[in-house]
Amino acid sequence: MDKTTLSVNACNLEYVREKAIVGVQAAKTSTLIFFVIILAISALLLWFQTSDNPVFNELTRYMRIKNTVNDWKSLTDSKTKLESDRGRLLAAGKDDIFEFKCVDFGAYFIAMRLDKKTYLPQAIRRGTGDAWMVKKAAKVDPSAQQFCQYLIKHKSNNVITCGNEMLNELGYSGYFMSPHWCSDLSNME
């Protein structure tokens, strides 16, 4: 240890210098440990990337899917505006179009209506997912029709709207999927 004693007005500065040396040594040690940890993490990441680790393959696939979905946002915006204009034209003079009805899609019924604000198709939602699709057992199925009416009476406070709302909540808009009730309704009318 470097010991130099400096006395000023009867004060001994040797103690302060010894503490400073300990502090400098601690700073050197912590800096060395930090760089060794960073080097180890970098080497580990390099090994993961060069060894075709499935974790990075999944992350790459997820990033591709996320970027693709973000690209769909502009398409969904355009389609939502078109469908809203179409709904506005359909609703001209028809107030009953804003009330829930059981719409027959062939293999299933869906309780749906047009939204009064956006003029987009709205259906009664099953929990936190997509719309209730009441499957039919035959071409004419009174029990499926009856259950659809039950949904209108008791579950009509939980709805999902085609377009941007559906894209934000479920990850798809319903317009670009086939078969889906949003795209099927667009093709039916």
Swiss-Prot record:
Xref: InterPro entries: Pox_LP_H2 (IPR005023)
PTM remark: Contains two intramolecular disulfide bonds. They are created by the viral disulfide bond formation pathway, a poxvirus-specific pathway that operates on the cytoplasmic side of the MV membranes.
Compartment(s): Virion membrane; Host endoplasmic reticulum membrane
Highest rank taxon of the organism: Viruses
Residue ranges annotated as Virion surface topological domain: 50-189
Keywords, sorted A to Z: Disulfide bond, Fusion of virus membrane with host cell membrane, Fusion of virus membrane with host membrane, Host endoplasmic reticulum, Host membrane, Late protein, Membrane, Signal-anchor, Transmembrane, Transmembrane helix, Viral envelope protein, Viral penetration into host cytoplasm, Virion, Virus entry into host cell
GO annotations of cellular component type: host cell endoplasmic reticulum membrane; membrane; viral envelope; virion membrane
Pfam family name, one: Pox_LP_H2
Membrane topology summary: Single-pass type III membrane protein
Protein name: Late protein H2
Organism: Variola virus (isolate Human/India/Ind3/1967)
Organism placement in taxonomy: Viruses, Varidnaviria, Bamfordvirae, Nucleocytoviricota, Pokkesviricetes
